[in-house]
């Protein structure tokens, strides 16, 4: 009788060891801009799916460090970001590329004679220059 009780107690635990939890693997593909205001392009591999994310520090919060992540379900969605940046590069001041989850606005700083972009996600906001956009465009095209 003791053997049956022991078997019924051990078998469920032995069976659960066959089911391993596989956590998503995240790797940085490109560091667009380093600290203190980082922007990183990441690849997230979860079982059979590969998705991408743009991680950036929210510039609306100055009292602390808040990192926001803009997810892209697949490479095609990431290419839409590249197409939007390419179109805005050829555009004018105030042009906006609007998507379901985010928008990119082109702004120009007249004194510095440079082009800036404002990326607004679901909860965060970051700015980046044309040189950083070019780095992001060329890397996405190479994927």
Feature map (PLM): residue ranges:
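Sec-dependent N-terminal signal peptides
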Residues: 4-13
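Positively charged, low-complexity terminal tracts
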Residues: 17-143
């Amino acid at each position: 009788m003791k053997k049956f009780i022991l078997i019924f107690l051990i078998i469920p635990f032995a069976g659960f060891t066959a089911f391993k939890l596989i956590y998503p693997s995240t790797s940085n593909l490109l560091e667009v801009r380093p600290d203190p205001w980082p922007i990183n392009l990441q690849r997230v591999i979860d079982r059979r799916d590969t998705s991408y994310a743009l991680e950036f520090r929210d510039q609306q919060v100055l009292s602390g460090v808040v990192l926001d992540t803009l997810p892209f379900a697949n490479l095609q969605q990431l290419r839409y970001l590249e197409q939007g940046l390419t179109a805005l590069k050829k555009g004018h001041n105030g042009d906006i590329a609007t998507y379901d989850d985010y928008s990119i606005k082109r702004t120009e700083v007249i004194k510095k004679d440079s082009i800036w972009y404002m990326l607004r996600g679901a909860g965060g906001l970051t700015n980046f220059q044309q040189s950083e956009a070019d780095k992001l465009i060329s890397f996405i095209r190479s994927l």
